[in-house]
Amino acid sequence: MSQCVPNCHIDDTPAAATTTVRSTTAADIPILDYEVAELTWENGQLGLHGLGPPRVTASSTKYSTGAGGTLESIVDQATRLPNPKPTDELVPWFHHRSSRAAMAMDALVPCSNLVHEQQSKPGGVGSTRVGSCSDGRTMGGGKRARVAPEWSGGGSQRLTMDTYDVGFTSTSMGSHDNTIDDHDSVCHSRPQMEDEEEKKAGGKSSVSTKRSRAAAIHNQSERKRRDKINQRMKTLQKLVPNSSKTDKASMLDEVIEYLKQLQAQVSMMSRMNMPSMMLPMAMQQQQQLQMSLMSNPMGLGMGMGMPGLGLLDLNSMNRAAASAPNIHANMMPNPFLPMNCPSWDASSNDSRFQSPLIPDPMSAFLACSTQPTTMEAYSRMATLYQQMQQQLPPPSNPK
């Protein structure tokens, strides 16, 4: 059995194969449908006679495909060709089965872009052209070759098949040259597009994450700075006595006033030269006695036979202290003012040696200093200091 199958060349442009069916004048021999035939020589020619029951033809399903009945229709069309007039050909049934198989194998199953073109040529019964699975464009450029005649039909129909060496190009639906739209390409598939979108979203999310992280670090540093400021303000509020302000501006105003008053007090103490205020009570009393003895040399007794030595009248000193109740205990008398120290001489007049006590404004100032340290006390001390500065006489310039 000889079958004609078109050759497939990958690099060539596909071309359609044509099949030309030509009838001959061979005589139709109905004995071909029998299983057993008898050869006889009649009148110088070879004849066939069928023996036995007729043969039942079965349809071949070897080359059938699921193309919706297209291949079956082509095979059926080829088998139902009209029988031509009988001719005197010898043994016309040798290639009876191979003709149908050749036509079945030579047919290409069409796809979506199918082009059916039926052409009839003079001298042939039917010619069928079947399109390939590519576009609807016309295919050409193949090599044409003639195939040896074959017998088909009921008996004496001879088929002459003109074939082309068809080249089929293996096309990839995912290549960029064969795709018209990007959405039809396999390369631009949905998972790949989703991956690209995820990459873009990942880049945006990384930028937003960096910004949020920087903002969080900035907020944390600002929070620490505010906590430090609040802690310093609380410590400063504790240093200011009787401070009841809560807002920062009022607290700072109180601190400023307090510092001004402290500065006035320090300047007053430095001008008056009062280091004894920093000494304990016993040392202050001892210093008072020493200064009183040194400042009043006339109070020394001379009539007791002890020249250069004298004793202090403690009773008179106590009476003088009792006669001046307005003087504070911490008050040190002015060392330049003589104390009331009468001598042991009874004939002497006490009035000559008694010096009147000069009221000192520092007593009131020091009395205020013993009170609890408040803003009013500091303001009162500052006022007294100003009055003292006004009452002091201007110093005389020696010539």
From Swiss-Prot:
One GO location term (cellular component): plasmodesma
Lineage: superkingdom: Eukaryota
Pfam families: HLH
Subunit structure: Homodimer. Associates to PTAC12/HMR/PAP5 which acts as a transcriptional coactivator. Interacts with the Pfr form of phyB but barely with that of phyA. Binds to COP1.
Upper taxonomic lineage: Eukaryota, Viridiplantae, Streptophyta, Embryophyta, Tracheophyta
SUPFAM superfamilies linked: HLH, helix-loop-helix DNA-binding domain
Keyword Phosphoprotein annotated: no
Gene Ontology biological process terms in this record: de-etiolation; DNA-templated transcription; double fertilization forming a zygote and endosperm; negative gravitropism; negative regulation of seed germination; regulation of DNA-templated transcription; response to blue light; response to far red light
Job description of the protein: Transcription factor binding to G-box elements (5'-CACGTG-3') in target genes promoters, particularly in far-red light but barely in the dark. Required during the fertilization of ovules by pollen. Repressor of phytochrome A-mediated far-red light responses including seed germination, suppression of hypocotyl elongation, and randomization of hypocotyl growth orientation. Does not inhibit phyB-induced red light responses.
Regulation (activators, inhibitors): Stabilized by phyA but destabilized by phyB. Accumulates in the dark but not in far-red light upon MG132 treatment, a 26S proteasome inhibitor (at protein level).
Induction section of the entry: By cold treatment. Down-regulated by jasmonic acid (MJ). Accumulates in far-red light more than in darkness and red light; this profile requires COP1-triggered protein degradation in darkness, phyA inhibition of COP1 in far-red light, and phyB-mediated protein degradation in red light. Follows a free-running robust circadian rhythm, with higher levels during the dark.
Molecular function GO labels: DNA-binding transcription factor activity; protein dimerization activity; sequence-specific DNA binding
Occurrences of domain bHLH (ranges): 213-262
Chain intervals for the UniProt region annotation (Disordered): 119-158, 173-228
Keywords, ordered alphabetically: DNA-binding, Nucleus, Transcription, Transcription regulation, Ubl conjugation
Cellular compartment(s): Nucleus
InterPro entries the UniProt entry points to: bHLH_ALC-like_plant, bHLH_dom, HLH_DNA-bd_sf, PIF1-like_bHLH
PTM entry text: Ubiquitinated and subsequently targeted to protein degradation by COP1 in the dark, but not in far-red light.
Protein name in UniProt: Transcription factor UNE10
